[in-house]
Amino acid sequence: MNHRQQRQLFLENLLVGMNCMFHQMQKRSINTCCQNLQKILDRLILLQTIHSPAFRLDRMQLRQMQTLACLWIHQHNHDHQVMLGAIKWISPLTKQ
C-alpha cells in the first residue's frame, strides 16, 4: 500500500470513527454538539498519529477539518454518501 492509499484509508477511518462516536453522544444543542465533535476529532487525530511519523505532519491539516466536518455532518444528516464525498473533497490526494 503506497502513501496515498495509506493516507486515504487513514482519513476514511478517522471520519468514520468520528461519525460513530458522534452517534453515541447525547446531542443537546448545535454548539455543544460541535464542541464535542471537535474534542472527539482532536482525540482521534492524536491516537491515529502519535505512533506514526508519516502522519505527524498531517495533524495541522486534519485539525483544520474540524469545522468543516461539523458543518457537513449537521447539514447532511449523517448521509453516508455525502460523508464519502466529503472525504474525497477534503483529501487533496484523491483529486484527479
Swiss-Prot record:
The keyword NADP does not apply. Its main location: host cell. Pfam families: Rota_NS6. The keyword Transcription does not apply. One of its GO terms (cellular component) is host cell mitochondrion. InterPro entries: Rotavirus_NSP6. Keywords: Host cytoplasm, Host mitochondrion. It is found in: Host cytoplasm; Host mitochondrion. Coiled coil: none annotated. Belongs to the rotavirus A NSP6 family. Interacts with NSP2 and NSP5. This is Non-structural protein 6. It comes from Rotavirus A (isolate RVA/Human/Belgium/B4106/2000/G3P11[14]).
